[in-house]
Every structure is written in structure tokens, then in C-alpha cells.
């Protein structure tokens, strides 16, 4: 006897699972979300890990200011408040040069960039936005297409050139478009912190998109509020979330997914669909079982590649001071939401990747950092500050080729990261650190078990795992070879980051398959260029 019967069951209560759940519940379906952890939200984790009153975003930190649920769910009514400062991103070079991206001010950004970047490259970047990106925005919030079918909003030579760039590696498209090493480094590092190495092939569209502003924000009171607001909308529409419910088995009968069984023996029936927000190996090899798969699908899951170059090591600190960069950089840099430093050239970035690929933490540290309290003082008690610095490294089991663990090196690495940051903001002394906390790749994969190896995107971005190949061709459109089973997590197009794309796209596909009329309107990104001449 089943413990409950629902129209749809979603495995995994991360933000993509909750996004799909909200759309389906508002559609009028009876929906159950099952989450292994005692807290839903997946990577949207905010905790007091240093001192009481200091709130730290342990995994997901930034959120895109656009995305369908913002308007469709009216998330502001459920407690979600996005915070944006005057400077969205500040990229600091060791020689004192800086690139400042001003929030929703592309003209000001253009004039600041032209002090560092040749005008021809800036004009090219703006042209990429208007010539290509404004006409292909719908590709992001839609099932992926093969290159030959992409760019339907473009004509003639523009479409051919766009398709040509889509098939390039990140580095190839940067070299194709731009001359300035600094601009190419700026784009490559922005892509890097989203888990996309510039050596990946067939991902050129990803690098083109940096001509458009991601409109980065942080969430007031922490990224956990994203999960709370999504769940509040879901609950308001009759949805049910059960935490502490690890799904052990997706029940397949006659080639169709008809329910799930949890590790503690409970069984839930699904009359219309089951959707998985977790990674392909766990979904298909563990939950579905190889007896229901073709040998080809089983092998694709075994071949699933984790993020070998972008495992995350997080430096979190409760600080007595906010970083002050003004000794070497402008006062404006102190207003930055996301701060990049430590990688000055593409050659340095190549060395970064090489060292990580050989199992080492880079000898010259570099990544992105954030002082949340510059934008939102609620992250810390009055007068205090919350700091975060992300450094990429090898996966948990590849560190020093398995000879060491992150626990072995975390204290030393924390101090190296503080000292590296202090090269740019000298006031970040040991004495000003009230408490520090290491969030290692081991911690990540132990908390979020489908972030295998301690990555941030639920699987590497490679030509074999991007676009129509993500997670693999037979499941790239959110439908899977198992009837009634769908994928909806970051292992699907368009990948990770809090843009809600996989959950939203899966909702569109499922409603179509059910023959229902969507309650929500078509979505169009209201984008802006990073920079503009006028």
C-alpha cells in the first residue's frame, strides 16, 4: 500500500526542483517534493558558521536578477528581496588597473573600461550583444537545439557566424572576437567562476554571453531565502515537501516511471510524472536501475564527467572590517559586489588550469570574492562584516593525486587565501579576522551528494555535456528514455547558477506532454549590454 499518491513527484528539493514544483502546483497538479536533507534548497545554504549573527552563503552566493519565477511566482511577495550595489563586478589587476562593471549603467561601464581596453574591442563587445545576443535570448529558456538549428532569429551571414562561434572552445571564441588579453582574461574568469573553463570545446555561446549583463545580485538575509520563497509559493498552491526523505528507487513498471521508494521504506505513487533534480548517475544507475536501461544509456551515465578543474574551496570569515582596496585601486572598487583578483593574463589562467589538472592548488591563488555587508548589512551584527573568497582546485579525491585530503591542507590554505586577498585589500589582517571557516570540496559533496567531487555545477561543462549533450542526447530535452521520467536539475541545459533555467524548461516540456495549457506567459529575458557607447 502506498504512503501517498500524487500527480507528480520531484526527487530533490533544490532550487530547480522547487521551481518545477511551483509551476506544476500552480497548474493544478498534486505535487510532492522529496528531499534527502533536513533542509530544502540544495546549494542555497546560508548558515552561521563563524560567529553568531554572521551569515554565510556556503555554496550558491550570487543570483541573476532575471529569471521566470521572479515574475511568474511574484517571489517578492514571499520574502525574496534582491540586493544590488552601485558596482556589480570589479576586476583588479596587480599593476593597479581595474575593470568596473556598473549596475545597469552600460554607458558608465564603457567609459571606465576604455581606460584599460582598446576601443575597438569594446565596440566589438557591444556589437556582439546587439547583433547576436538580442536575437537568440530565447535559446536559454528553451530545450537545447543542435547547432544547425540555432540562431533562428538571425539571418544569412549573422546566423552562419553565430553557429560557427557556438562550436568553438571558449578560448577560440575569445581570440576570434577580441585582441586585448585583459578583456579576454576578464571574460574567461567570469566564465570560470560559473564553472566553465575556457579550454572547453563546443561552448562558444557561453563566452559570447558575457557581452550581456547577468545582473548579479545577492539575496537579503542570504541565499537560503531563495528556497524559502520558492517553497512558500509551492505550499501556497497546495504542494507538499518532505525533508529527510532520501529516494532510493524510482519505480518503473512497463517502461514507465510510476512512483518512488525512499530509503526508509515509504512508497509514493506518481500518476503523471516523476522528475529528478539530481545527477544522471544517481538518477539512472542507482534509482532507476540498469535493468531498465539500454547498455548505451548505462554507459553514458558511467562516463558522466565531474568537474575536474572547478571544485570549490571556500574561505569564509567574520571580519571586523570591510575590504579596502583604495591604497592601490579606486574608491569605487570598494563598492563592488563581486571582486575578481589573482589572475592577470590568459597565460596565468592556463597555469591555473594546468596545476589543478595535476592535482594541485594553484601556486598563485586567484578567484572571486564578496563582502556581503557592503551591500546588505543584515549579513552581520552592527559593525561586523561577512567575507567570502572562492578558490578553484582539484576534486576531493584528486588532491595531490590522492596523497592528501582537504582536511590536511585547509588551515594552511585559509591563511594563504587571506594573505592573497590582503595583497589587494591590506586591511584584511589576521587581527581583523574575528573567525574563519573552510568549506572544502569534501564538505560540499557530503552536504550535497550530487555535487560529486565538490564542484558547483552538477557535472563538468564539456562538449560532451553541453547543449544537446547535457546530460546526454537521449535526455537533453528533459524527457528521458523512461516514459514519465524527466530531468530538471543543473545537469541539464542551461546548467548551473541561480537562473532557474532547468526547472523552468522542464515545466514547459511536462505541461506540453500532459496536453495542458500553461498558466504562465512565455518568458523573454529583459537583458542589457555590459557596456554601451551611447
Residue ranges and their predicted role:
Residues 1-8, 26-27, 467, 518-534:
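Extreme N-terminal leader/targeting segments of oxidoreductases
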Residues 95-200:
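Rossmann-like flavin
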Residues 180-194, 362-370, 427-493:
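A glycine-rich dinucleotide-binding beta-alpha-beta segment and adjacent secondary-structure elements
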Residues 207-266:
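Helical element adjacent to the flavin cofactor pocket in flavoenzyme catalytic cores
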Residues 322-323, 357-362, 406-446:
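Flavin-binding catalytic cores
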Residues 490-511:
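A conserved FAD-binding loop/helix module that cradles the flavin
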Amino acid at each position: 500500500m502506498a504512503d501517498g499518491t500524487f500527480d507528480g513527484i520531484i526527487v530533490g528539493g533544490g532550487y530547480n526542483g522547487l521551481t518545477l514544483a511551483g509551476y506544476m502546483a500552480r497548474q493544478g497538479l498534486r505535487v510532492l517534493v522529496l528531499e534527502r536533507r533536513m533542509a530544502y534548497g540544495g546549494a542555497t545554504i546560508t548558515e552561521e558558521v563563524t560567529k553568531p549573527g554572521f551569515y554565510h552563503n556556503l555554496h550558491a552566493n550570487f543570483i541573476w536578477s532575471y529569471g521566470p519565477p521572479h515574475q511568474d511566482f511574484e517571489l517578492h511577495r514571499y520574502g525574496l528581496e534582491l540586493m544590488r550595489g552601485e558596482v556589480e563586478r570589479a576586476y583588479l589587476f596587480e599593476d593597479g588597473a581595474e575593470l568596473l562593471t556598473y549596475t545597469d549603467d552600460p554607458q558608465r561601464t564603457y567609459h571606465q573600461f576604455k581606460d584599460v581596453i582598446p576601443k575597438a574591442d569594446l565596440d566589438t563587445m557591444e556589437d556582439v550583444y546587439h547583433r547576436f545576443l538580442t536575437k537568440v535570448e530565447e535559446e536559454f529558456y528553451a530545450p537545447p537545439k543542435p547547432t544547425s538549428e540555432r540562431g533562428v532569429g538571425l539571418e544569412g551571414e549573422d546566423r552562419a557566424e553565430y553557429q560557427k562561434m557556438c562550436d568553438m572552445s571558449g578560448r577560440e571564441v575569445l581570440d576570434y572576437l577580441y585582441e586585448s588579453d585583459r578583456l579576454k582574461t576578464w571574460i574567461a574568469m567570469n566564465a570560470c567562476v560559473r564553472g566553465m573553463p575556457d579550454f572547453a570545446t563546443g561552448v562558444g555561446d557561453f563566452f559570447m554571453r558575457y557581452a550581456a549583463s547577468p545582473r548579479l545580485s545577492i539575496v537579503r538575509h542570504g541565499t537560503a531565502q531563495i528556497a524559502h520563497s520558492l517553497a512558500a509559493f509551492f505550499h501556497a498552491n497546495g504542494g507538499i515537501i518532505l525533508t529527510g526523505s532520501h529516494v532510493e528507487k524510482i519505480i518503473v513498471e512497463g517502461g514507465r516511471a510510476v512512483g518512488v521508494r525512499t530509503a526508509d521504506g515509504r512508497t509514493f505513487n506518481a500518476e503523471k510524472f516523476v522528475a529528478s533534480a539530481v545527477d544522471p548517475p544517481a538518477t539512472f544507475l542507482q534509482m532507476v536501475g540498469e535493468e531498465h536501461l539500454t547498455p548505451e544509456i548505462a554507459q553514458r551515465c558511467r562516463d558522466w564527467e565531474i568537474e575536474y578543474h572547478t571544485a570549490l574551496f571556500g574561505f569564509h570569515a567574520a571580519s571586523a572590517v570591510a575590504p579596502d582596496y583604495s591604497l592601490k585601486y579606486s574608491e569605487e572598487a570598494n563598492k563592488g559586489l563581486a571582486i575578481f583578483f589573482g589572475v592577470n593574463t590568459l597565460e596565468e589562467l592556463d597555469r591555473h588550469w594546468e596545476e589543478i589538472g595535476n592535482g594541485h592548488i594553484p601556486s598563485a591563488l586567484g578567484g572571486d570574492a564578496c563582502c556581503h555587508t557592503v551591500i546588505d548589512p543584515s549579513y552581520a551584527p552592527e559593525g561586523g562584516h561577512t567575507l567570502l573568497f572562492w578558490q578553484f582546485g582539484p576534486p576531493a579525491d584528486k588532491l595531490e593525486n590522492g596523497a592528501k585530503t582537504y582536511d590536511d591542507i585547509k588551515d594552511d590554505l585559509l591563511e594563504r587565501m587571506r594573505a592573497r586577498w590582503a595583497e589587494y585589500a591590506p586591511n584584511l589582517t589576521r587581527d581583523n579576522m574575528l573567525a574563519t571557516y573552510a568549506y572544502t570540496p569534501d564538505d560540499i559533496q557530503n552536504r550535497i551528494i550530487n555535487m560529486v567531487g565538490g564542484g558547483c555545477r552538477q557535472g563538468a561543462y564539456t562538449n560532451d555535456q553541453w547543449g544537446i549533450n547535457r546530460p546526454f542526447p537521449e535526455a537533453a530535452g528533459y524527457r528521458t528514455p523512461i516514459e514519465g521520467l524527466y530531468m530538471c536539475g543543473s545537469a541539464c541545459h542551461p546548467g548551473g547558477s541561480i537562473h532557474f533555467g532547468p526547472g523552468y524548461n522542464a515545466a514547459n516540456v511536462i505541461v506540453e506532454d500532459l496536453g495542458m495549457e500553461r498558466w504562465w506567459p512565455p518568458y523573454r529575458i529583459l537583458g542589457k549590454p555590459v557596456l554601451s557607447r551611447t
